[in-house]
Amino acid sequence: MNTYLDGDLIRLARRVHNTRRAYLLVNPLQGKHIPVSPGAALSMMGALGEKLALEQPGIDLVIGFAETATAVAAAAAARMGRPCHYIHTTREPGTSGESVEFREEHSHAVEQRLRLSRLRPWIDRARAIALVDDELSTGRTMVNAIRTLGEACPSIRQKPLTVASLVSRLGPDPMPALADWDIRFVSLVHRPMEDYTSAVSRYAIEPARSPEGKGLDYDEGVLPISGMDARDGVGLPEWLDALAAASDPLLEGMADGLRGKRVTVLGTEECMLPGLVFGQRLEAMGYAGRVRFHATTRSPIGVGRDEGYPIRAGWRLRSFYDAGRVTYIYNLEACDLAIVITDSRDDAATKAAMEDLTAALREAGCGAVRLIREERHVQHL
């Protein structure tokens, strides 16, 4: 199992227009705000799964937290060495069925929800449950989620719970409000709780800007993984296997155009694992000269040029899921080809988002763009 130090997983950035918390811990290996080798990102996420399996064997249900931990939790679950069910929270409205809501109190977008149609019977049958986030500071979001699940799914009170994260800043008595629950804690890195407001105040920042001019033309393709949506719940490793099986034929068909090229694979908001797996398969096949992955996000982060500051460039984009919502992409690098992988159901929002994103990619020095949408969300007219 790979080991990591806090210097491997933590960079400090300034939030924009967030009165709850002025700073953000940015993980350079997570594949969200900073381009990263897909293999390196999945190795780090897998290390958390290996640690979970070692310290808390028997987990057969994993719950991940949107937006930034959707891939973290799934990749960790897949590396635990046993089949399990996986579901992640979402900020997107549900299409049908019952769900429960809770608050992520320090976030720019505080409302989170869990869909219950599959989750409730999974909780009833589970031997042990893990709740996985990328970073835990106060633990309030996790407390809110566990309390909400306790009300909606009372059987969870009889299950051993493990709260896992890449980075934990929880203290010795992390969740006194849940003292009567059976809860354990696992993390890759532990760092004492500290307020970094003054530490980030020295950085000169400006907000991300809207791209200018016309975007690049782009080709479209389909990733055929019908019927699998982690917002509703999926099985692992089946979901990971399906993503790999769907990616390989696409990559083989693109092989001649990828040889020696610099390729950036981009996910969209909560949709991160499909792009990470696609990028990792491309990386492993050896077609491309360089593969990097990161994703769009709802998080408004300051852009700065001070030495050591992690967010060096940023663009405002319309969301792939709601054209009236603002999202962002940070640290785009020059590349020969950008491949955007999304599970958006909204054709109009996807078109609007691609207009903005391709304009940002053009400004960053990208040569060509390909959009790949998951098959279940393509409307056949």
Name these PLM-found stretches.
Residues M1-L381:
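PRPP-associated nucleotide enzymes
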